[in-house]
């Protein structure tokens, strides 16, 4: 069976067992590793592997051709995209919203240390940057990982509230190129995802806004990010069962996937990869459940009502 997912640690962790023939009864996987902007495009054209990881924001465009697999994706709390600017110092998440820094919280939970926290030399609680006022973005250039990414959809909803002067100019870059582009002055700000939550201080960047914090405060719901989809007509029940088995194997045998995860994690350190997995692989990955589905319906329904995505039949999310 052909499948496409990203080389990010959460995806390789989730699918390691299945991709390595460790799930009884599951078909052999032919894996393509692709950035989510690529899989979003494939799904929109009805091309690519029959099973793919795409952005939830891309789902309304393809629900007539693809079914949502209610597991294996990325949805949670405290894991939203960030808007970053270049500035004199990095304002950690804790400085911006008064909560404990993600790295400190996850360090306490996992016992892993060494990542920058709010009190480290990477942090600068008094830092300011020209972009700390969201209105500063009006008319400027912001790099995003995909114009059909959930990160960008959240940004559009946030910007409609926070940027009265109108939306900035948008350019699409692979997510690993966004922070260097902001640092080097090629763009004014960047919308980042994944491990950038942990590593942006190393680029001398400043946090302007956390889309997840905004979404959770506005709705009380978790943040839908990435979805697993399959061509309609495939056995969704079996795909769900095999994916859940792969997730459960990964949790029960975390060391088994370490080499595979690190192979595709590019230059990410093992510690950052572990934090990445800890943040993005959670109970919603094992099963969306009713809370997860409500979050998806809320995000996409709101976006559709504002003309940001096509209108769709919510029943198709469950069929």
Predicted region positions:
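Hydrophobic residues within well-ordered alpha-helices
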Residues: 42-45, 182-183, 303
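Hydrophobic/proline-rich hinge and linker segments of small-molecule sensing/allosteric domains
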Residues: 70-95, 119-131, 215-232
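Pocket-lining segment of extracytoplasmic ligand-binding domains
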Residues: 173-263
């Amino acid at each position: 069976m052909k499948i496409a997912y990203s080389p990010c640690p959460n995806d390789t962790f989730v699918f390691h067992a299945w991709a390595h023939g460790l799930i009884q009864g599951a078909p052999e996987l032919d894996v393509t590793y692709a950035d989510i902007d690529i899989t979003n495009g494939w799904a929109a054209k009805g091309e690519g592997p029959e099973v793919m990881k795409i952005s939830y924001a891309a789902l309304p465009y393809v629900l007539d051709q693809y079914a949502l697999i209610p597991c294996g994706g990325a949805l949670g709390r405290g894991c939203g995209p960030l808007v970053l600017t270049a500035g004199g110092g990095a304002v950690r998440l804790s400085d911006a919203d008064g909560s404990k820094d993600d790295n400190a919280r996850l360090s306490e939970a996992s016992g892993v240390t060494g990542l920058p926290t709010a009190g480290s030399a990477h942090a600068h609680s008094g830092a300011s940057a020209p972009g700390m006022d969201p209105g500063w973005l009006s008319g400027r250039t912001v790099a995003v990982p995909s114009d059909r990414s959930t990160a960008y959809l959240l940004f559009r909803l946030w910007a409609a509230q926070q940027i009265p002067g109108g939306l900035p100019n948008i350019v699409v870059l692979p997510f690993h190129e966004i922070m260097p582009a902001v640092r080097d002055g090629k763009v004014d700000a960047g919308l980042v995802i994944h491990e950038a939550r942990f590593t942006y201080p190393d680029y001398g960047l400043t946090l302007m806004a956390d889309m997840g914090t905004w979404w959770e405060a506005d709705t009380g719901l978790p943040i839908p990010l990435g979805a697993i989809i399959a061509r309609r007509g495939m056995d969704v029940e079996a795909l769900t069962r095999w994916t859940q088995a792969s997730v459960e194997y990964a949790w029960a045998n975390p060391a088994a996937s370490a080499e595979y995860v690190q192979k595709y994690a590019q230059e990410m350190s093992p510690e950052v990869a572990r934090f990445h997995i800890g943040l993005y692989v959670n109970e919603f990955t094992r099963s969306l459940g009713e809370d997860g589905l409500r979050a998806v319906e809320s995000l996409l329904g709101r976006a559709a009502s504002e003309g940001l995505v096509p209108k769709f039949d919510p029943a198709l999310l469950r069929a």
